[in-house]
Amino acid sequence: VSQSQKQLARENLLEFDKQGCNLFVRVNDLDSAFVRDDLACLEKCGEVGIMLSKSEDPHAITQWLEQHSVTRQILCLSETVMGFAHTSALMQHENVIGCAFGHFDFSTDLGCEADISLLAPYRADLVLQSKLHGKAAPLDCVTADISQIDQLKLDCVDAKRRGFGGKLLIHPSQVKPAQSIFLPSKDDYEKAKELVAVTASQAVIQFEGRMIDKPILKKAEQLIEKYDRLMESKVFDAHR
């Protein structure tokens, strides 16, 4: 958001219907002159989380939270080399629930091209650190060209295969295509339930011609749990 539009963005947030939403609001980084006004706006918004730009120092986050008497959940944006180097420490912070990758700022700071294939090792480490510290699977970086929905879908498939739980989006037109990749379908849900039921009722080691072992069974159970959770939240339409 440009400097001239920041106050309008805060006013729009106050008017946004937040009922039924697990909402996180991106705020300016802790060194920014705008973060105080961002926080003042959030204080009027009820139980919304913070997506913290350029998250770098867990100790600075603690001091900032204590100074402003804030107890909100935080989603860290990994956008700098320093922040990436502190990923493990950030993921251990009690207020932090997960992270997301901002590849444009990160590549600028690192001095490389903003090519997600070149940044694959850093993306993989965010997935690893999130899992290691029991946090939510991270959100992958944006697809900047909003006219290229097919590319967005390819990027979502790639992110999902790498272990990301979702993707940062920059335009409403990207929401449904991304959901179609990351959210379990009704067919996937029913097939997972059938697999779990069959393996529970008999000593089956094959399902639809495929060998079933513990990792495959666990993935099916995770899909069922995710689908049920999303349906209960009523935020997403998982009945595609």
Predicted regions, residues:
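Expand to "…catalyze enediolate/carbanion chemistry for C-C bond making/breaking, isomerization
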Residues: 1-240
